[in-house]
């Protein structure tokens, strides 16, 4: 509990003890009134003050006004204990609500704890000066000690360490980083001293963008929240006028038309009971709190949601479209097979790696990585790169060619046809065919499991879009269990394909696009819900996406959908429960069957139950 909550708790205890003690005292008349006013003012002075300020500001019809009128009316009718009890239990409900919001905020603030307090700038004499991260310019060298947060995005110039990214990704496994590696702000340096050259200003760094996104999430309200806001705007004045009519019309009818005693006191008490029952706190508080808790729970799982409207849309997702490279595959080319004739595997890889040693092409890098030994460029001469075909060179005086079938055709070398899916590098040594090396993009470890999990979530169709060859795309789709694949697409074709799918789906069905944030901004924006995966350090993805998954695990997609559906389920549970109980109690109150104690349950009891139910949205670990 914070200080404010502790003060309210003490007031509740004091007022409750005084109310019980006074109920046992044999006092009556003015003395009883004066004595009961003590616990009433102890517990309710702030509500009365808020109600008075609301009247002065012409914002009359709110829960404070309802509570003030109902309790003052009960006291004026001589029901002192009921008047104090209504205010007492209302404050208990408010305390529960405050605690629930605080718990949700703590989840968000744990994420907010990634905000760095300072940056260490190294002076010319070698000493360190602590400055505000906003003051650090691009290209500055900052020093990050063990245990400190990385304040600004940059590249490591000196040092090696393990980085704790759990606050950003929800994953506890540390990430190794050394010289030349990019580091993002918000990570915690676990071991060595790092010197980092900044590549961004603090305002443009990853941590700043994430914090800005989370802080603004509450401004984007869902359809349910907007409905409740409009509902409360008209509902509260309506029940106030209804209570007034209940207090005046039945007694007048009894007096003027039926010739009976009006029984003003009984009907006024019914009207006050009606007011207490009608207080919309359970709805007005629990619905936004459910979404707030859902966003907080999601952030702890490494899923950042930009607003409750996106959480609501995600829960209705029936079509999921994936970009292939970097989303379902790792986007890293690796040698997946070596098929040789007379030459052994290691010698073939050595020739290929040396022939490609001067190239920075991803395929060249994968060949050098597969060979795995130091390369001596001095062994290589007469290097000639043939654009779109491959490379020829002399390795230790031996003519080596590495490339596609077109290169082999140019050289007059008959090559073996390869039916495996991937990029084929044919090898010719000394004018003779020596074999081929197969290079492919590796599928992510949990990709197949992720597709199965989506189908289990009720997703009707999964679609993959890629610029790869038809055969390669088809094999990946079949291996993963993806329903539909569109290949050989240019970036603009992906937008057109998503628009076509949007036209085909049902009106209430939503389409989500999942990309890695690289060149995906137009498609992320066009889909009903844009999900950027592994978006750490990708400004475009954080900007364009509605939901950001902070690591590369495709299983997080189905988890995000389950979180959204749990949150929406809780929202509807609270709506049906609160409205159902209130309608029943309002009817019973108007008929004089439900007394003030029943009204207390219909207001405070329902609010406490709804708030406790809303807190469940925080618990996402088992989803």
Name every feature range the model reports, one short phrase each:
Residues 66-68, 168, 269, 279-355, ...:
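Conserved catalytic phosphorylation-site environment of P-type ATPases
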Residues 22-23, 29-31, 36-122, 135-142, ...:
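Actuator/coupling domain of P-type ATPases
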Residues 14-16, 227-258, 270-291, 572-601:
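Bilayer-spanning, highly hydrophobic alpha-helical transmembrane segments
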């Amino acid at each position: 509990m914070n200080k404010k909550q502790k003060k309210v708790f003490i007031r509740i205890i004091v007022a409750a003890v005084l109310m019980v003690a006074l109920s046992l005292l044999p006092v009556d008349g003015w003395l009883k009134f004066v004595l009961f006013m003590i616990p009433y003012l102890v517990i309710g002075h702030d509500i009365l003050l808020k109600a008075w300020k609301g009247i002065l500001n012409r914002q009359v019809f709110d829960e404070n006004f309802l509570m003030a009128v109902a309790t003052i009316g009960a006291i004026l009718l001589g029901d002192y204990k009921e008047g104090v009890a209504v205010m007492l239990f209302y404050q208990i409900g408010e305390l529960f609500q405050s605690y629930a919001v605080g718990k949700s905020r703590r989840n968000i603030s744990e994420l907010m704890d990634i905000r760095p307090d300072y940056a260490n700038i190294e002076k010319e004499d070698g000493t360190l000066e602590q400055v505000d991260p906003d003051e650090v310019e691009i290209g500055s060298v900052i020093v990050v000690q063990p245990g400190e947060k990385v304040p600004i995005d940059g590249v490591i110039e000196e040092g090696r360490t393990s980085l704790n990214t759990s606050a950003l990704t929800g994953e506890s496994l540390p990430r190794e980083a050394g010289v030349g590696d990019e580091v993002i702000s918000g990570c915690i340096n676990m071991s060595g001293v790092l010197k980092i050259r900044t590549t961004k200003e603090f305002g443009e760094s990853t941590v700043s963008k994430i914090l800005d996104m989370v802080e603004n999430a509450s401004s984007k309200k869902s359809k349910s929240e907007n409905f409740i806001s409009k509902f409360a705007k008209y509902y509260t004045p309506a029940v106030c006028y209804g209570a007034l009519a209940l207090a005046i019309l039945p007694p007048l009818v009894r007096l003027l038309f039926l010739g009976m005693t009006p029984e003003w006191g009984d009907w006024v008490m019914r009207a006050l009971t009606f007011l207490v029952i009608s207080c919309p706190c359970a709805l007005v508080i629990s619905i936004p709190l459910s979404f707030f808790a859902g966003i907080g729970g999601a952030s702890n799982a490494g899923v950042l949601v930009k607003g409750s409207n996106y959480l609501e849309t995600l829960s209705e997702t029936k079509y999921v479209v994936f970009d292939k490279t970097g989303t379902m595959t790792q986007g890293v080319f690796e040698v997946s097979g070596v098929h040789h004739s007379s030459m052994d595997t290691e010698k073939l890889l050595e020739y290929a790696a040396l022939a490609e040693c001067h190239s920075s092409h991803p395929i060249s890098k994968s060949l050098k990585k597969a060979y795995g030994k130091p390369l001596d460029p001095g062994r290589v001469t007469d290097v000639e790169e043939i654009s779109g075909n491959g490379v020829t060179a002399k390795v230790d005086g031996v003519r080596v060619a590495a490339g596609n079938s077109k290169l082999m055709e140019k050289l007059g070398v008959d090559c073996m046809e390869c039916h495996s899916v991937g990029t084929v590098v044919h090898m010719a040594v000394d004018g003779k065919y020596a074999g081929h090396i197969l290079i492919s993009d590796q599928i992510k470890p949990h990709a197949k499991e992720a597709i199965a999990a989506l189908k289990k979530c009720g997703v009707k169709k999964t679609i993959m879009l890629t610029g790869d060859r038809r055969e390669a795309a088809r094999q990946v789709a079949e291996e993963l269990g993806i329903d539909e694949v569109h290949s050989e697409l240019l970036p603009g074709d992906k937008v057109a394909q998503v628009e076509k799918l949007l036209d085909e789906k049902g009106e209430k069905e939503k389409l989500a696009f999942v990309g890695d944030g690289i060149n995906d901004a137009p498609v992320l924006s066009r889909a009903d819900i844009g999900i950027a995966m592994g978006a750490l350090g990708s400004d475009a993805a954080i900007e364009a996406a509605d939901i950001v998954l902070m690591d590369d695990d495709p299983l997080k997609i189905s988890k995000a959908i389950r979180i959204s559906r749990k949150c929406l389920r809780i929202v509807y549970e609270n709506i049906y429960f609160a409205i159902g109980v209130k309608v029943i109690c309002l009817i019973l109150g108007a008929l004089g069957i439900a007394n003030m104690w029943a009204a207390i349950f219909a207001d405070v009891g329902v609010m406490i139950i709804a708030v406790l139910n809303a807190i469940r949205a925080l618990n996402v670990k088992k989803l």
